[in-house]
């Protein structure tokens, strides 16, 4: 049997993934009893997992009202992507012309996984697209930068889930592929412009899109994540 800390981590990771893949949409209620029932965990364990997500600003915990998936305003969305542009441009400046063949191969594999999921219409596409940016940050070798990027990517998923098309990332597979080529070539001017334009386009596409239906029950939404946690 898993220890309490492991169970907290399992539920935290499952909920975070469901938010990242836009299965749990902004504003979705997160009742401790329903989540605990789905994962076979106590409310205390679920509450701790929700507190970790609240620390990343992915969940809002309201006194006497329970937890919900965070719902950023348009102003917060614009501020988030402005900060993310600065951070990601710093990332690509560090990596420009410094990618090893192994780095390029890893990024290409990430893009291929993204493209396959996109072609099949699977929600994993969103996660793969987001992880592309996380992998770039990881390649910089800074644990602090990596943690910050994970938080920015998670908050971005809320923006895209709230204002974009349902279960979509608005990232372009081809834009990712072109960025890797430019990084490998080492042209800093092109790389800088490409990352700025890429993130600007992601936000613009999100804010131009219509929102979708978000009315499924929490247990139904989390069922595949609970099953994956049990089998893992």
Question: Where do the language-model regions lie?
Answer:
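Conserved catalytic core of Hanks-type protein kinase domains
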Residues: 52, 80, 86, 139, ...
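C-terminal regulatory/effector modules of DNA-binding transcriptional regulators
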Residues: 166-232
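Conserved amphipathic alpha-helical segments that form helical-bundle/coiled-coil interaction surfaces
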Residues: 98-161, 172-185, 190-201
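Short linear motifs at protein or domain termini
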Residues: 1-97, 207-232
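Short, flexible helix/strand-to-coil boundary loops that buttress conserved ligand/catalytic motifs
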Residues: 73, 81, 118, 149, ...
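Conserved acidic
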Residues: 3, 7, 76-79, 83, ...
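Short helix-capping/hinge motifs at transmembrane helix termini and TM-loop junctions
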Residues: 96-97, 141, 164-166, 211
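Mobile beta-alpha loop/short-helix "lid" or hinge segments that flank ligand
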Residues: 54-60, 152-154, 168-170
């Amino acid at each position: 049997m898993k220890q309490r800390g492991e169970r907290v981590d399992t539920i935290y990771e499952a909920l975070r993934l469901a938010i990242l893949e836009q299965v749990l949409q902004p504003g979705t209620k997160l009742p401790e009893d329903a989540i605990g029932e789905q994962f076979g965990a106590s409310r205390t364990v679920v509450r701790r997992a929700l507190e970790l997500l609240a620390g990343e600003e992915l969940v809002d915990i309201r006194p006497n009202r329970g937890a919900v998936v965070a719902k950023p305003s348009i102003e917060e969305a614009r501020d988030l992507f402005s900060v993310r542009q600065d951070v990601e441009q710093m990332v690509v400046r560090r990596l420009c012309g410094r990618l090893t063949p192994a780095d390029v191969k890893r990024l290409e594999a990430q893009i291929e996984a993204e493209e396959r999921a996109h072609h099949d219409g699977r929600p994993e596409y969103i996660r793969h697209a987001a992880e592309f940016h996380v992998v770039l940050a990881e390649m910089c070798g800074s644990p602090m930068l990596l943690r910050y990027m994970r938080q920015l990517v998670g908050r971005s998923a809320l923006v895209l889930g709230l204002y974009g098309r349902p279960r979509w990332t608005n990232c372009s597979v081809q834009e990712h592929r072109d960025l890797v080529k430019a990084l490998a070539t080492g042209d800093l001017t092109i790389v800088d412009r490409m990352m700025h334009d890429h993130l600007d386009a992601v936000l613009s596409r999100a804010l131009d899109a219509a929102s979708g239906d978000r009315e499924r029950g929490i247990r139904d939404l989390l069922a595949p994540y609970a099953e994956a946690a049990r089998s893992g």
